């Protein structure tokens, strides 16, 4: 069974990636678990703020939130992985501020969120290095630049 992707566009925004692009990015990030079911929900800043406040106790809309399906496999008939919530206006603003190609930033955040669902994290430096290295490798396969490279004096802001 291939990847089952439920794409929910709760907030329309200009220049959103296609469902095929979201699927390709997820399949790339989830190669080690190709039989997965996940939802990607695209939200506005109000919903992004509400979710980030409720689940992370942060008072701002963040770029991507990941929610792992915490259900024992034996209780499911499907390989449910979890949900990603991506705030489209934040993605667009970050790409502009960080002078990154918009589609490359979308790809990065989808891959980043999928890796969280697989158990990767960036809480400590060693975990962050492992996760960021994998992100760089996967994005390079797509022909996208290193998302952590910085052309100016100020490093790009990185939201967790």
From Swiss-Prot:
> What name does this protein carry?
Endoribonuclease YbeY
On the tree of life, the source organism's domain of life is Bacteria
* Gene Ontology CC, one term: cytoplasm
Gene Ontology molecular function terms on file: metalloendopeptidase activity; RNA endonuclease activity; zinc ion binding
Q: Name one GO biological process term.
A: rRNA processing
Q: Is Nuclease there in the keyword field?
A: yes
The UniProt similarity line reads: Belongs to the endoribonuclease YbeY family.
Gene name, per UniProt, is ybeY
Which EC numbers characterise this protein's activity in its record? 3.1.-.-
Which key words tag this protein in UniProt?
Cytoplasm, Endonuclease, Hydrolase, Metal-binding, Nuclease, Ribosome biogenesis, rRNA processing, Zinc
What does the cofactor field's note say?
Binds 1 zinc ion.
* Primary role: Single strand-specific metallo-endoribonuclease involved in late-stage 70S ribosome quality control and in maturation of the 3' terminus of the 16S rRNA.
Q: A Pfam family in this protein?
A: YbeY
Q: Which InterPro entries does this one have?
A: MetalPrtase_cat_dom_sf_prd, YbeY, YbeY_CS
Q: Which PROSITE patterns match?
A: UPF0054
Q: Where does Zn(2+) bind?
A: 112, 116, 122
**Residue stretches spanning the membrane:** none
NCBIfam families per record: rRNA maturation RNase YbeY
Using the UniProt record, name the top-level EC class of this enzyme in a single word: hydrolase
According to its UniProt record, where is this protein located? Cytoplasm
Matching entries from SUPFAM superfamilies are given as:
Metalloproteases ('zincins'), catalytic domain
Q: Which organism is it from?
A: Pseudomonas aeruginosa (strain LESB58)
Q: Which cofactor does it need?
A: Zn(2+)
Instruction: List the PANTHER family hit by this protein, alphabetically.
Output: ENDORIBONUCLEASE YBEY, CHLOROPLASTIC
């Amino acid at each position: 069974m291939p990847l089952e992707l439920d794409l929910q566009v709760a907030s329309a925004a200009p220049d959103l990636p296609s469902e095929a692009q979201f699927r390709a990015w997820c399949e790339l990030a989830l190669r080690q678990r190709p039989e997965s079911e996940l939802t990607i929900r695209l939200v506005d800043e109000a919903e992004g703020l509400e979710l980030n406040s409720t689940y992370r106790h942060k008072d701002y809309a963040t770029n991507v939130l990941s929610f792992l399906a915490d259900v024992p496999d034996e209780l499911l008939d499907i390989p449910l992985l979890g949900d990603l919530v991506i705030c489209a206006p934040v993605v667009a603003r970050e790409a502009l501020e960080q002078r990154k190609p918009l589609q490359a930033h979308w790809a990065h955040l989808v891959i980043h969120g999928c890796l969280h669902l697989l158990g990767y994290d960036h809480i400590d430096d060693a975990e962050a290095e492992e996760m960021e290295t994998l992100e760089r490798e996967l994005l390079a396969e797509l022909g996208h630049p290193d998302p952590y490279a910085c052309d100016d004096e100020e490093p790009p802001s990185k939201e967790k």
